A protein has these predicted regions:
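Class I SAM-dependent methyltransferase Rossmann-like catalytic core
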Residues: 106, 189-197
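Conserved class I S-adenosyl-L-methionine
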Residues: 215-222
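Conserved hydrophobic/aromatic pocket- or pore-lining residues that grip, position, or stack substrates
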Residues: 120, 144, 198, 206, ...
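Glycine-centered loop/turn positions within well-structured domains
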Residues: 142, 204, 216
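Class I Rossmann-like S-adenosyl-L-methionine
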Residues: 1-187
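Glycine-rich helix-loop-beta junction characteristic of Rossmann-like nucleotide cofactor-binding loops
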Residues: 188-189, 208-214
Length: 222
């Protein structure tokens, strides 16, 4: 994890590529270990601004500085630090105190650079920007778009239930099934057979908005 964070922060490598490489390192890791490693790296990257401020370190980050950032993450997540030399002088109470102090300020609380906070306020105003920014830090739900050419929402829901993947309907999104808990749906036969795709709910409404008719040619660009 430390090597991965150094590659991302110091070398500018893409987090997803670094995580994929890290997960290949030890074939003995089970799904729980792999999930822990991936989520730890992504969390520390996402909350870098806040954690760096609490750890009182500056770029470029050597190994000791990365360990300090990692210690901040561990303390704030409620983990008991092991008896390693890297954690010998970790100021647990100070870390918690700095967290309470810094999270009174929006740019630290949401862990974004000054320029982004200033731009958001300028474009949207204080109230809307604060609300929108907080929403960006909520983990998005996994939402499926049912392929009604091949199945129905009810049939797909039952198929997934047999795999212990629970979903729910939403009145505003006629083609959507929303997972109640995150799961790797790409491994299912239903996905391989084209019964659904993963797509956020708002994007699913675009097809209805366009009111496409048979015989029309549609260009889907991004």
């Amino acid at each position: 994890t430390i090597d991965s964070l150094m590659a991302i922060f110091n070398e500018g490598e893409y987090a997803d590529k670094v995580v994929a490489r890290a997960l290949k390192k030890d074939k003995r890791w089970g799904s729980h270990d792999r999930k822990f490693v991936a989520e730890t790296i992504y969390e520390i990257v996402r909350w870098k601004r806040l954690y760096v401020e609490i750890a009182e370190v500056k770029e470029p980050f050597d190994r000791d500085k990365i360990w300090r950032i990692f210690a901040v993450w561990a303390v704030l997540r409620g983990y008991n630090l092991p008896d390693w030399k890297y954690f010998e002088e970790t100021p647990v109470r100070r870390i918690k105190g700095k967290f309470d102090e810094l999270t009174k300020t929006r740019k630290f609380k949401e862990s974004i650079p000054d320029w982004m906070d200033e731009l958001g306020v300028k474009e949207l105003g204080e109230e809307i920007w604060t609300k929108e920014l907080a929403a960006q830090n909520d983990q998005a739900k996994v939402i499926l778009r049912v392929n009604k050419l091949k199945t129905t929402k009810e049939k797909l829901r039952a198929l997934l239930m047999d795999l212990n993947i629970e979903t729910e309907f939403h009145n505003d999104y006629p083609d959507a099934l929303i997972l109640t808990e995150r799961a790797n749906v790409f491994l299912t036969d239903a996905f391989k057979e084209g019964f659904f795709e993963v797509q956020d709910a708002s994007s699913q409404l675009v097809a209805y908005f366009l009111d496409v008719k048979p015989g029309m040619r549609v260009v889907d660009t991004c």
